[in-house]
Amino acid sequence: MTQMTVQVVTPDGIKYDHHAKFISVTTPDGEMGILPNHINLIAPLQVHEMKIRRGGEDEKVDWIAINGGIIEIKDNVVTIVADSAERDRDIDVSRAERAKLRAEREIAQAETTHNIDEVRRAKVALRRALNRINVSKK
């Protein structure tokens, strides 16, 4: 059976490198499922979870919190260059919960001062924290 090589790379280095038979990511246009022999493609990624179904007998599923970036698909090699990425097993949930609370406070404070840029920045931080929390529960 044909499989793809999946690599997730961040400024901190390679976070994931395995073979897979299915990948699910989220782009600005919505969720995208990727199977082997997919057409070549480059697309931006949203802050969202990434699902990777590995090949083999155990059909293991890996989950990664992707916090923006791009995906490139070429010749059964899927490369994701992400701003940051964490596997479900590596997420510090208490840290993510603290980040969520901090972002919620920053949103409330920025809204009272009508600081639109700060509201946007805090909402991105909130999405990232919620993404990490959701992936940690998979």
Curated annotation (Swiss-Prot):
Membrane topology type: Peripheral membrane protein
InterPro entries with a match to the protein in the record: ATP_synth_F1_dsu/esu, ATP_synth_F1_dsu/esu_N, ATP_synth_F1_esu_C, ATPsynth_dsu/esu_N
Gene Ontology CC: plasma membrane; proton-transporting ATP synthase complex
GO molecular function: ATP binding; proton-transporting ATP synthase activity, rotational mechanism
Location(s) in or outside the cell: Cell membrane
NCBIfam families: ATP_synt_epsi, PRK00571.1-3
The protein's name in its UniProt record: ATP synthase epsilon chain
